[in-house]
Amino acid sequence: MRVGGGPLVTTRLGSLRGRRVVARSTPQAPYYSFKGIRYAEPPRGSLRFRPPAPLEPWSGVRDALEEGSVCPHRFMLFDTYKGDEDCLFLNVYTPALPDLMSGYNPQLPVMVWIHGGAFAVGSGNAFLYGPDHLVGAGVVLVTLNYRLGALGFLSLENEEVSGNMGLKDQVMALKWVQDNIEFFGGDPNRVTIFGESAGAASVHMHMLSPVSRGLFHGAIAQSGSATSPWALAKEPKNRAFELGRELGIDTNNTAELLGYLRATPSELLVKAAARLFGIAGKTADLQSTVALPFLPSVEPDIPGAFFTDEPKAYLPGADVPFLTGYNAQEGILLLRRLQRYPKLLNEIDNEFQRVIPPKLSTGGPEAVAKIVNQVRAFYFQQRPVDMRNIDSLIDVST
């Protein structure tokens, strides 16, 4: 519906005013944007570390003209803190709106983007992921924020803080899409979720989790899966206590730790979690998940749990069309780790097993040694692991 001041959409929770936008890619095909739409209550105070709380309806018209705050994280370009805990927003971009007067309803296919960033950084805002191309192809695009790092994935392995808050945020957003996307010209029966890296792992996890069943009808995972070695935290409770010690609280009491973490400003949590990157042991190991301290994890068997077993136990998952893949030389991200840990090349040269995926490192010592030698010979022949042969190492890590 068009009204003075911009397009108006009435959802099941209340009315929103958006903008009519001229696309940069196809100026002759304008679209409508509705930004900064809340899909859950702000997860602050007592709601920190809890599943998202349903949003209450409102009266009047809310502006949906600007993107909402991003969730707290370290901004990757400038390595600075950014965000606010009041961050559970999504954005909707649509090429056509229903017309109540004429009865016109476009019922367009819907794509929901789940951003990547190691479950620790990023947002769904248009800073990196603009809508013009997909909207120009006749798609209703939804992008979203979800809680990151400790705020999104810390687990005490109990009912109070069972973990996976960020994944549950995504579920809440998908429920919002099912309830409301028809008012933006989308078809709730043609929803495809897609994501990259941690977003791809999230997509695959939704295919496997019972709590996401029926919320989408197709999935695209770009460079990541639920079974990627970096996508699941082992012993997540220990990581929570490590975070407490990094913040100056040395306790073995779960309730005491939780009280402290709930009272700590989000900026301090984010910065302390960043210092945990690479703690303990061989922290530069290519397959180490310790370098990503807060990740999805297995939860206790409680109502609303996202996973109560490892993702592989849920395979094959939802019976929906699924597209997945990766790009050549994605392992170039390794160069950033080399900058932080210059001894890595020499360590890998001496202990090449460290680059072998865990799934190939099973069996007895002789079987593992044979696999290691075969992989090394395939990529390096007789050459050493050094900067002269960095392309080969990038290929291995890809």
PLM feature spans:
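Non-catalytic accessory segments of hydrolases
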Residues: M1-L167, P188, V298
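Surface-exposed acidic, glycine-flexible loop patches that form ligand/cofactor-binding
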Residues: T94-P106, D132, D179-D187, P210-R213, ...
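A short beta-to-alpha transition loop/helix N-cap that caps and shapes the active-site region
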Residues: A150, A201, S225-L232, G331-L334
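Alpha/beta-hydrolase active-site loop
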Residues: V161-F183, E235-G244
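Short beta-strand immediately N-terminal to the catalytic nucleophile in serine-hydrolase-like folds
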Residues: I193-E196, I220-Q222
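Short glycine-enriched nucleophile-adjacent loop
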Residues: A200-S212
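A conserved short beta-strand
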Residues: R213-S225
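Substrate-gating cap/lid region and adjacent catalytic-acid/histidine neighborhood
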Residues: Y260-A263, E267-T398
